[in-house]
Amino acid sequence: MSRYRGPRLKIIRRLRTLPGLTNKRPKSRNDPTNQSSSRKISQYRIRPEEKQKLRFHYGLTERQLLKYVRIAGRAKGSTGQILLQLLEMRLDNIIFRLGMALTIPGARQLVNHRHILVNDRVVDIPSYRCKPRDVITIIDQRRSRAMIGKNLDLSQKDQMPNHLTLHSSQYKGLVNQIIDSKWISLKINELLVVEYYSRQA
């Protein structure tokens, strides 16, 4: 299954808030989000819906998400927590969480177009797994600085997660550590995602 490129609000109405996909919100009047939240979701539907939340928030194909689930399953510890850590430490997500891009698709575009440096080297792979002590900067071009500077000004001024440090005047971000689960911005029951894939096996 390919990466979704259709209307983003359509997904938000069905799955509710996905900050990585879009910062837009459906109109409050007759908002299907409010209607669907009061409707009891069957156990049959809830697992695939949680899986879809993860897919659309992080902008993954079905094959990519399955690959991450398998990697998490082979690691020691909670498969669900490790899965979220793997996704949060992707370069495109790190750029989004730093505020250098307003969405994860926007961050992916910055990476693909070679605007991003990791430890002073151009990295054009959005799935690159960041690690503690990585330094994220941008190429020294006027266009890159203007674009990312605008994103930094427009990004929501939420508290920066403790695994990251941003030096906005230098267009630089630091990865301090692996993310702690309490700083994951997506409201998700990751265990249901793991259960979904275990039932598919």
Curated annotation (Swiss-Prot):
Domain S4 RNA-binding stretches: 89-157
NCBIfam families, per database record: PRK05327.1 (NF003717), rpsD_bact (TIGR01017)
Gene name per UniProt: rps4
Biased segments, Polar residues type: 31-41
Gene3D superfamilies: Ribosomal Protein S4 Delta 41, Chain A, domain 1, RNA-binding S4 domain
Family: Belongs to the universal ribosomal protein uS4 family.
Positions of the UniProt region annotated as Disordered: 20-43
Example of a GO biological process term: ribosomal small subunit biogenesis
Alphabetized SMART domains for the sequence: Ribosomal_S4 (SM01390), S4 (SM00363)
Taxonomy, superkingdom: Eukaryota
Cellular localization per UniProt: Plastid, Chloroplast
Keywords recorded for this protein, A-Z: Chloroplast, Plastid, Ribonucleoprotein, Ribosomal protein, RNA-binding, rRNA-binding
Keyword Ribonucleoprotein carried by entry: yes
An example molecular function term from Gene Ontology annotations: rRNA binding
GO cellular component: chloroplast; small ribosomal subunit
InterPro entries: Ribosomal_uS4 (IPR022801), Ribosomal_uS4_bac-type (IPR005709), Ribosomal_uS4_CS (IPR018079), Ribosomal_uS4_N (IPR001912), S4_RNA-bd (IPR002942), S4_RNA-bd_sf (IPR036986)
The species this protein was found in: Cycas taitungensis (Prince sago)
Predominant cellular place of this UniProt entry's protein: plastid
UniProt entry tagged with the keyword Hydrolase: no
Name under which the protein is recorded: Small ribosomal subunit protein uS4c
Function: One of the primary rRNA binding proteins, it binds directly to 16S rRNA where it nucleates assembly of the body of the 30S subunit.
Assembly notes: Part of the 30S ribosomal subunit. Contacts protein S5. The interaction surface between S4 and S5 is involved in control of translational fidelity.
